[in-house]
Amino acid sequence: MSAQKSAGIQLLLDAEREATKIVQKAREYRTKRVREARDEAKKEIEAYKAQKEAEFKKFEAEHTQGNQAAQEEANAEAEARIREIKEAGNKNREQVIKDLLHAVFTPSPEAMAAH
């Protein structure tokens, strides 16, 4: 019986070694699949990100042109108003200076009102 026990024990040890190899291969395969899945997910994320960035740039380009035109129009209006104000200032400059000098150098006695 000793030989049978020894053969049985040896058979169990061989089966255990074989099971260990199978488990190890399964772990390696699972690890490999997890890495592959992670890499695939990264690629999908990058592709999605690139697509959304392209869509955003297209949207931005379409809408920036309208804003740019409005901004240019506003700038033109502002410059026109500035020119008008400068022209009005230049036109009345002499009279304003005369009035200021007259007011400063010509005393006019006025009674101080009690507050």
From Swiss-Prot:
Keywords: Hydrogen ion transport, Ion transport, Membrane, Transport, Vacuole
Cellular component aspect of the GO annotation: vacuolar proton-transporting V-type ATPase, V1 domain
Recorded topology in the membrane: Peripheral membrane protein
Cellular location(s): Vacuole membrane
Keyword Cell division annotated: no
Any single Pfam family the record assigns to this protein: V-ATPase_G
Role this protein plays: Subunit of the V1 complex of vacuolar(H+)-ATPase (V-ATPase), a multisubunit enzyme composed of a peripheral complex (V1) that hydrolyzes ATP and a membrane integral complex (V0) that translocates protons. V-ATPase is responsible for acidifying and maintaining the pH of intracellular compartments.
PANTHER family: V-TYPE PROTON ATPASE SUBUNIT G, VACUOLAR ATP SYNTHASE SUBUNIT G
Protein name: V-type proton ATPase subunit G
